[in-house]
């Protein structure tokens, strides 16, 4: 009750995960689990006001169902908010039976709303809220952006039920597999906003222009509090621009090192390549960094300019060179295909730059324009997409969302990749079907085939963890991950594990027509794990600076 308001939280996601992770003789249906929990909380607390937050478009239907049930249980006003709501608030309000929606950051605007309700301010001073009134939507757009002082507060962790147990049920981020075994994980935010203006990103829409940093002492005290009270040993930074302000960043990491908290961390949301200076990365490594992602998206200079990326190919190469000096940091790169007007040769540029960077993993996505972003408006204006808002958005959530989506697609034509590329015009924009093939080719060669040439013992151990996380967690039964983990098992003279992986791989292929089609195209087979013979071992990696059609693509 810091401001005289009594607040209680309920995390429906954690309740559902905890329920189904707990062994029991009989399980209730999914819907009953969260509905019973929500009903019990509302009836016990009897709130004057119910707020529901939704970050991801893919959970829109959950937002709608939770809102609807809340209205059935209580006659009190129900409001919604979060990134998803902000990005397309009019359409969301048309589909979700909420009384109002708070848009953008609600730290100050919600308190302003309370003051208006209490009669301390006139209604004309309402900010960042959309109110349903007799079938109409009244929108108050005045922006109240929290200052660095406003956000330099310790979160009210006491409102979160059993924070220390969260890691037992599910995972978060791209690098949880690299934390110490059984280490508990939490999230922390040091900065809000991003200096970049990437046209495909909604961060600037939500947070506004620029970056606001929390006081370093407050951030480190928060991490120390999590360690002391909840035994948290790994944090994932939620920042969209963690390396903003070089001196501030180095000071933050040095303070973490000085305090010797014994906490590791990762940056799953990506960092700006131009900000990856040696002193920053050295301080990051010393303070416990286990993994980070560079936001590259494209290796073509024209595309980079058009989407307003804050970096050049030179920046990407330099950042990769510096990261290779810190092998304990698992370094990934965000790549994206399918930008407006992006030709096949431009996609080759991305492939070639990524290959030359030679980092640990490449998270490849196909562009999905989000409402309220410049690229969405551009594509609508050019007739490339229809203005249907979130209704057609299919977020590729997590590091392997694209893979999971492809596996559900109709079977692609069974052709070798050499044939596919030979029949494409390098100066033409590929069809969506061809982009899918290009994606699969890039994923195999940038992430998997290169493992044949890996010799560094530190990197081999990290890649084994990555592969295990893929086929056990992020993309269950992923055939390529199983195949290459089997290769490492054979490399380490572990035929028992190789046989186990062989059986799992056979089962995965039996259930996936898609992968039964693609495995021969890559010249890989489960039998290789049994025979300890891997024909592609002798196939050279893609050379930087050359097009795939020019490569020695034996079986590919």
Residue ranges and their predicted role:
Residues 1-222, 227-231, 463, 485, ...:
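Acidic, low-complexity intrinsically disordered segments
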Residues 9-11, 80, 267, 333, ...:
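A structural preference for short, hydrophobic beta-strand core positions in alpha/beta folds
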Residues 13, 84, 240-245, 270, ...:
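Short, solvent-exposed turn/loop segments enriched in Gly/Ser/Thr/Pro and often Arg
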Residues 18, 130-133, 137-144, 330, ...:
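C-terminal accessory regions of radical SAM enzymes
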Residues 18-19, 301-306, 374:
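A short acidic, helix-capping loop that chelates divalent metal ions and anchors anionic groups
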Residues 52, 80, 237-239, 294, ...:
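Conserved beta-strand positions
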Residues 91-109, 283-291, 349-364:
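Structural recognition of alpha->loop->beta junctions
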Residues 157-337, 343-346, 352:
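Radical SAM [4Fe-4S] cluster-binding motif and immediate context
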């Amino acid at each position: 009750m810091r401001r005289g308001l009594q607040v209680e939280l309920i995390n429906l996601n954690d309740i559902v995960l905890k329920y189904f992770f707990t062994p029991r003789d009989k399980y209730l249906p999914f819907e009953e689990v969260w509905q019973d929990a929500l009903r019990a909380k509302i009836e016990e607390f009897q709130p004057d006001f119910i707020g529901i937050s939704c970050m991801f478009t893919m959970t829109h239907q959950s937002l709608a169902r939770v809102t609807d049930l809340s209205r059935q249980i209580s006659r009190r006003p129900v409001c919604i908010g979060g990134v998803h709501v902000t990005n397309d608030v009019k359409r969301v309000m048309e589909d979700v039976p909420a009384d109002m929606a708070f848009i953008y950051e609600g730290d100050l605007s919600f308190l302003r709303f309370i003051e208006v309700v209490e009669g301390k301010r006139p209604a004309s001073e309402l900010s960042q809220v959309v109110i349903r009134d007799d079938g109409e939507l009244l929108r108050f757009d005045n922006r109240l952006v929290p200052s660095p002082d406003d956000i330099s507060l310790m979160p009210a962790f006491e409102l979160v039920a059993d924070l220390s147990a969260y890691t037992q049920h599910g995972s978060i981020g791209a690098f949880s597999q690299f934390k110490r075994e059984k280490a508990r994980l939490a999230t922390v935010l040091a900065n809000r906003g991003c200096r970049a203006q990437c046209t495909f990103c909604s961060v600037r829409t939500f947070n506004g222009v620029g970056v606001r940093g929390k006081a370093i002492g407050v951030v480190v005290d928060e991490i120390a509090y999590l360690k002391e009270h909840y035994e948290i040993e790994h944090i994932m930074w939620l920042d969209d621009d963690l390396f903003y302000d070089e001196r501030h960043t180095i000071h933050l990491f040095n303070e973490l090192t000085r305090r010797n908290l014994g906490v590791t961390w990762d940056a799953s949301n990506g960092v700006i390549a131009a900000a990856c200076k040696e002193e920053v990365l050295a301080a990051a490594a010393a303070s416990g960094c286990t993994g980070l992602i560079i936001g590259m998206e494209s290796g073509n200079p024209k595309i980079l300019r058009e989407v307003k990326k804050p970096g050049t190919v030179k920046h990407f190469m330099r950042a990769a060179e510096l990261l290779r000096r810190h092998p304990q940091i698992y370094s990934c790169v965000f790549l994206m295909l399918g930008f407006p007007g992006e030709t096949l040769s431009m996609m080759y540029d991305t492939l070639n730059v990524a290959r030359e960077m030679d980092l640990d993993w490449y998270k490849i996505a196909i562009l999905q324009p989000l409402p309220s972003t410049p690229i969405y408006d551009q594509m609508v204006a050019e007739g490339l997409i229809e203005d249907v808002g979130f209704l057609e958005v299919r977020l590729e959530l997590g590091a392997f969302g694209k893979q999971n989506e492809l596996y559900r697609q109709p079977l692609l034509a069974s052709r070798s990749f050499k044939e596919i590329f030979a029949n494409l015009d390098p100066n033409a924009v590929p069809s969506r079907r061809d982009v899918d093939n290009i994606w699969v080719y890039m994923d195999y060669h940038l992430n998997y085939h290169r493992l044949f040439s890996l010799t560094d013992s530190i990197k081999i151990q990290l890649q084994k963890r990555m592969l295990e996380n893929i086929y056990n967690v992020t993309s269950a039964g992923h055939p390529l991950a199983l195949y290459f983990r089997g290769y490492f098992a054979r490399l380490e003279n572990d035929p028992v594990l190789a046989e186990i992986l062989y059986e799992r791989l056979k089962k995965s292929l039996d259930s996936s027509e898609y992968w039964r089609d693609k495995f021969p195209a890559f010249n890989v087979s489960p039998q290789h794990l049994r025979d300890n013979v891997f024909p592609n071992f002798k196939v050279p990696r893609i050379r930087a600076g050359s097009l795939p059609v020019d490569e020695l693509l034996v079986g590919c």
